[in-house]
């Protein structure tokens, strides 16, 4: 596709005042750009420099010191006082969020989500499970209901998922992901006075992951039942960048679902008919993370993996997918399974040291992953709301494309992005001004389109793929 040949015409809505229509109908003077061009907010870049590998190390070591954080480990008052078990870990995480809030002038609301999980395969008796989270409220009353979320699970396990007493350090799986969530809370909380994020950011640590994603299922169901406008979920699970020889410390995998888990059969048929198998909301979130990775020097680049998760494994992002939310998983490039779900031991015959211990975690790598997460959260929370009601006219047989959408809160302009149907990421972008309707001399038969909102500072929303409309 030769982008120099693309012509865009922007049209205003028929019912807006004539003066506004004149401004909206101005034809863009600039040609389409490559979608891979970076766009950086210097204030966000400055905030990312405050991510501390030392603090991340301290967080991981502290979580490991609780000995066994299994969901079925002790959480009575005596265990909490002794600093052992998941109850003690829960209280410490809560105290850390509270400390971060104090440091940013009370910017964080610290909360818990507690429920009782009934007996199941990995839950031998009714068990209390608590998710701990902190909320950084959006500064714009018109956008504060919009939410983005980062999470990791703070429970751990050893070789036996029903062993709640013997050591289960869980340094990589998943103290590393919990450390990312905590560090994002600390850094973005302090930065919020300057950045004044219009939308709300939630920093979450869930339990029950190793027993069946119990904590995240409950939290995602709560978000659905309460009609949260949750636009993005970043799940960090096994982001310790183990120090194995084949590890690539410059890459973090980002997994995303294709066909939405929550889609009804009629919607799946429509997706297949339109060729939208790679355009779920989660897939668009993954592409957004790739864009952030090009725009900010986090020290690690996202490798987009277009599947829900690794083989034989699962994660908390899928709980949110099941409820219809866009959610992705961050995981290190190459895993060392000797240091996951293993009893701590040394095999004299092979010389292999088993166990998920802190010494096998690369805290500098975790810090880089935290920067990528923080940059993504900051960009999403700074951006306008994604356009709603995005439609593509299909009533006539023609080689052009007409798109229309509803105005977004906080937007000063809109962009149309597109890519070839066989391309993994967006290839071209065209700014179309303040109008809410655009006609393009590009055939809808040959490409995938989406529309995103942009504010005056250049923060871009998640892109929204249009629905056909006759």
Language-model segments: residues:
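N-terminal capping segment at the start of a domain
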Residues: 29-84, 297, 338-339, 348-350, ...
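A non-catalytic alpha/beta surface segment that caps or lines the substrate-entry region
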Residues: 33, 55-137
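Active-site-adjacent mobile loop/cap segments within catalytic or ligand-binding domains
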Residues: 64, 239-260, 304-384
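Alpha-helical metal-binding/catalytic segments enriched in His/Glu/Asp
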Residues: 134, 150-151, 155-213, 373
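Conserved aromatic anchor
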Residues: 399-410
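Beta-strand-rich modules
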Residues: 440-460
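Extracellular fibronectin type III
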Residues: 456-470
């Amino acid at each position: 596709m030769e982008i120099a040949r693309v012509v865009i015409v922007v049209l205003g809505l028929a019912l807006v005042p004539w003066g506004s229509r004149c401004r909206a109908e101005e034809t863009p003077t600039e040609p389409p750009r490559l979608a891979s061009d970076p766009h950086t907010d210097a204030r966000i870049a400055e905030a990312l420099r405050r991510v501390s590998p030392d603090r991340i190390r301290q967080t991981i070591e502290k979580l490991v010191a609780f000995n066994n954080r299994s969901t079925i480990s002790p959480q009575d008052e005596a265990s909490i006082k002794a600093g052992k078990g998941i109850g003690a870990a829960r209280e410490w995480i809560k105290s850390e969020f509270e400390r971060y809030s104090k440091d940013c002038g009370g910017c964080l609301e610290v909360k818990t989500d507690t429920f009782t999980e009934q007996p199941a395969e990995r839950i031998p008796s009714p068990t209390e499970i608590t998710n701990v989270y902190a909320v950084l409220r959006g500064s714009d009353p018109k956008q504060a209901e919009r939410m983005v979320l980062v999470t990791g699970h703070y429970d751990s396990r050893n070789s036996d998922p029903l062993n709640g007493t013997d050591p289960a350090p869980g340094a990589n799986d998943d103290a590393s992901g919990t450390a990312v969530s905590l560090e994002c809370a600390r850094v973005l909380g302090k930065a919020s006075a300057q950045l004044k994020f219009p939308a709300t950011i939630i920093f979450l640590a869930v339990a029950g992951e190793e027993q069946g994603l119990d904590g995240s299922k409950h939290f995602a169901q709560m978000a659905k039942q309460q009609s949260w406008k949750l636009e993005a979920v970043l799940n960090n699970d096994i982001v310790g960048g183990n120090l194995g020889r084949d590890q690539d410390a410059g890459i973090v995998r980002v997994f995303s679902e294709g066909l939405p888990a929550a889609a009804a059969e009629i919607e799946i048929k429509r997706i297949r008919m339109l060729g939208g198998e790679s355009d779920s909301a989660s897939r668009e979130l993954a592409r957004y993370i790739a864009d952030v990775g090009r725009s900010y020097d986090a020290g690690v680049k996202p490798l987009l993996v277009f599947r829900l998760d690794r083989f034989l494994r699962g994660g908390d992002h899928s709980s949110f997918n099941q409820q219809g939310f866009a959610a992705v998983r961050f995981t290190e490039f190459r895993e060392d399974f000797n240091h996951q779900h293993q009893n701590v031991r040394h095999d004299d015959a092979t010389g292999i040291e088993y166990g998920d211990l802190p010494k096998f975690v690369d805290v500098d790598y975790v810090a880089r992953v935290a920067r990528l997460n923080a940059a993504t959260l900051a960009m999403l929370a700074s951006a306008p709301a994604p356009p709603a009601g995005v439609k593509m006219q299909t009533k006539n047989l023609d080689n052009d494309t007409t798109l229309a959408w509803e105005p977004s809160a906080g937007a000063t302009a809109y962009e149309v992005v597109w890519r070839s149907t066989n391309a993994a990421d967006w290839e071209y972008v065209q700014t179309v001004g303040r109008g809410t309707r655009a006609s393009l001399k590009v055939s809808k038969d040959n490409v995938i389109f989406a529309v995103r909102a942009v504010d005056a500072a250049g923060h871009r929303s998640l892109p929204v793929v249009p629905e056909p409309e006759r």
